[in-house]
């Protein structure tokens, strides 16, 4: 992949999160040889504090080569559950009050441990439970955390469900 990226003129490869840090370390000299930086994607439900990501960050700093870094996925900075996704659940048959409850739990960034149990008590249907499971795979990190990692951020990965003024 590194060689192909170089031949295509690409200088950054987004490495998926399940790649072991040891593989990244071993690939660093090869990446340097081909002038292709390897950036581990930090994607929800992972975040900068997750043990697996910490192992990668330790490797990046230990190897200390300019060809190892990170590619944060902007999904880890979702402050609220996107309305377009909530509305899709409702259109497909989820209960509006349960959708609202789940969205409020996510907005507080706490209570995830009891969410599924609480939603089941609300006589949830399959779609309500799917949404409750959906947010279990989301995370919120303050965007200010990017400042801590600026020297090793090679690129970002993003999709936009919606954008609000704040």
Residue ranges and their predicted role:
Residues 1-119:
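Active-site acidic/histidine proton-transfer and metal-coordination neighborhood
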Residues 83-166:
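Glycoside hydrolase catalytic-domain groove-lining segments
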């Amino acid at each position: 992949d590194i060689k192909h990226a170089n031949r295509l003129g690409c200088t950054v490869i987004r490495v998926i999160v399940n790649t072991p840090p040891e593989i990244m370390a071993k690939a660093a000299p090869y990446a340097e040889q081909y002038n292709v930086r390897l950036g581990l994607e930090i994607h929800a439900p992972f975040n900068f504090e997750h043990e697996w990501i910490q192992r990668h960050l330790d490797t990046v700093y230990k190897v200390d080569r300019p060809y190892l870094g990170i590619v944060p996925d902007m999904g880890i900075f979702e402050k609220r559950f996107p309305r377009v996704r909530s509305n899709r659940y409702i259109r497909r048959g989820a209960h509006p009050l349960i959708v609202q409850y789940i969205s409020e739990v996510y907005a507080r960034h706490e209570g995830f441990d009891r969410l599924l149990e609480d939603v089941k008590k609300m006589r949830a249907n399959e779609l309500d439970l799917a949404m409750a499971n959906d947010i279990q795979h989301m995370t919120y990190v303050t965007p200010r955390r990017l400042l801590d990692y600026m020297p090793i951020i090679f690129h970002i990965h993003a999709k936009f469900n919606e954008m609000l003024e704040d």
